[in-house]
Regions:
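Conserved pre-ATP/AMP-binding loop-to-beta segment of ANL
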Residues: 139-140, 244-294, 301, 321-330
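Conserved AMP-binding A3 loop
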Residues: 151-156, 282-283, 290-314
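Conserved ATP-dependent adenylate/AMP-binding module captured primarily in the ANL superfamily
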Residues: 192, 208-238, 253-261, 274, ...
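AMP-dependent adenylate-forming
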Residues: 129-154, 290-292
Length: 347
């Protein structure tokens, strides 16, 4: 539209309001091209409401990003929606005075959006369930790779996690919080996923802490053993106060039957049954604690922040919406798993 057409449309909307009609406008003036973020509202709304005697009803549309009506994948309409039917939440706020500014109305709409986000909780999966679902959908796509040359597809990663879970049951028996001291790597990712699918709370210990600081973390979480790697054990020569077990020894030489059993469960076992089997009948809920992230201990003993599955997965969803990742994108993660962003983004 040119300037003349725009003025005509504003006048027509104003005339409709005076005639007692309901006028619905998209105050941003354009479709968001940045992950569905709410853009600045335009002043045209104030021109429409000038000399009117009608309330303003703020309305928020949540979860539209990814539908055919969004600019997801850099195009509108001509794309396949992420799911069918596509869930959208429409929220209505309290009526606002006629003379409300466009910034005040935007503030109310954003507040509605924050409330609407909480409604997504019923549609969000735990970390383990989301990983299994992704592995089943993207079987041959690369899941993990590291600088040692290791590279795993999603289904091979899921099968490896299943084998690892069987091997770790004895070492982690009777523990809810389990300690891991492994740098960002394929092995570290698999160990974390094994703990999460078992329903454990994984505690990635900060290997830059002093021995005293690591012992404090171990004692606070009542950790009975720490899963690490041979290189880390040799290099750091730490004594955390509990046995340190090398992942290489735990995971080495899986038998033919172990591989076949893991492949069967990974490929054919129904997801719900698989999740119950891996967690011994007690799969975690969204509100269960997925990980504990400790501070650096610069102001005393390290302090642990407990993050639930909902904390982690909702942040992952927000990152995905803001950055609009594609199927062929690759994420280079350098932050360690004992860092909150490292656990969320790197893992």
């Amino acid at each position: 539209f040119g300037p003349k057409e725009l003025l005509k449309s504003l006048k027509k909307a104003s005339d409709c309001l005076k005639g007692g009609e309901l006028v619905c406008i998209f105050a941003e003036g354009q479709i968001s091209r940045i992950g569905g973020q709410t853009l600045a509202f335009q002043k045209g709304m104030e021109l429409i409401m000038r000399k009117q005697d009608a309330p303003i009803i703020p309305v928020h549309l949540d979860n539209v990003w990814g539908s055919i009506f969004s600019f997801h994948e850099k195009k509108v309409y001509w794309k396949v929606p992420r799911q069918i039917p596509y869930p959208v939440t429409v929220s209505y706020g309290k009526s606002m005075p006629t003379n409300s500014s466009h910034t005040e109305v935007r503030r109310e709409v954003v507040a509605l959006g924050a409330d609407a986000w909480a409604q997504r909780k019923g549609r969000i999966s735990t970390i383990g369930r989301a990983f299994v679902r992704t592995a089943r959908r993207a079987r041959t796509r690369m899941a993990f790779a590291d600088s040692t040359g290791k590279k795993l597809s999603y289904m091979r990663a899921l099968a490896a996690v299943i084998v690892l879970i069987k091997r770790l049951r004895k070492d982690w028996d009777g523990q809810q919080k389990v300690g891991i001291l492994i740098p960002p790597s394929v092995g570290g990712a698999l160990t974390n996923l094994a703990g999460i699918l078992m329903g454990k709370t994984v505690v990635n210990l900060n290997y830059t802490l002093s021995e005293e600081g690591i012992r404090s973390c171990v004692q606070q979480c009542d950790i009975k053993c720490v899963i690490s790697s041979e290189k880390v054990i040799r290099k750091l020569k730490l004594d955390p106060g509990v046995p340190m077990l090398a992942l290489e020894d735990i995971a080495k030489d899986p038998s033919f039957m172990e591989k076949m059993s893991a492949a069967f469960l990974a490929y054919l076992c129904p997801r719900g049954i698989l999740l119950k089997k891996l967690s011994q009948g007690n799969p975690p809920s969204l509100d269960d604690i997925a990980t504990i992230i400790f501070s650096s201990g610069s102001t005393g003993e390290p302090k642990g922040a407990m993050l639930s599955h909902y904390n982690i997965v909702s942040n992952m969803m927000q990152l995905n919406q803001a950055y609009d990742f594609k199927r062929d994108d690759r994420f280079l993660g350098v932050l360690p798993f004992f860092h909150s962003l490292g656990f969320t983004a790197t893992l």
